[in-house]
């Protein structure tokens, strides 16, 4: 193959990855990754815990523009504070995050935030941008001959993909706004969103080890928390009237978790990075 043909092929590849990923493709990617996650992480099988989080998450997801997805919610039996979402409606919440939530509206806000990432298709956008970066790297190698070995190409491609493993601040702001809307539509007060995030930010300052995984994929600053609090404060009081902040079933969940054996403290390397997504094949 001549250099010109290779360049043409790479340009066509770049155009291809810019195309939209269909919902069926997104679900297929999410399902494959969910199978890998469920085989790698300790998913809680306790029926009270699993059913509660599934029902809470589903009641919220059904209020969104992507209610037609087969939403699945899982609890990871880990003390680390983390939550992440895969394309297609697969949402994971660590036990450590539930432990930090003191009221229903706080847990609902965290779950609503992850639902927001799926609604906005942030992971899909990351994968598309990562694919574009890898094609651009290959194009550079072809034109400049800087990459003269498979090892060099692989190293650069992996580095390019890693740039997109962390949600952008814009993604996080969009997910926060979605969480406000989603919790309200589900009949839950959104005020718990900034409350929980502020608590996590304070804990990060004093004991970061169990909480750093969350911040590794969810950039958070005080400005972001203040912005969400201001968004909620700007709502008409009538919009918040009658919304739930807490209920007995949430505290039954917390009590059940206290009764169950505590998970071991895993090394950080055992936690699957939320951005480490791979498509079918």
Regions found by a protein language model. Name each.
Residues 6-9, 14-281:
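A Zn2+-metalloprotease active-site environment signal
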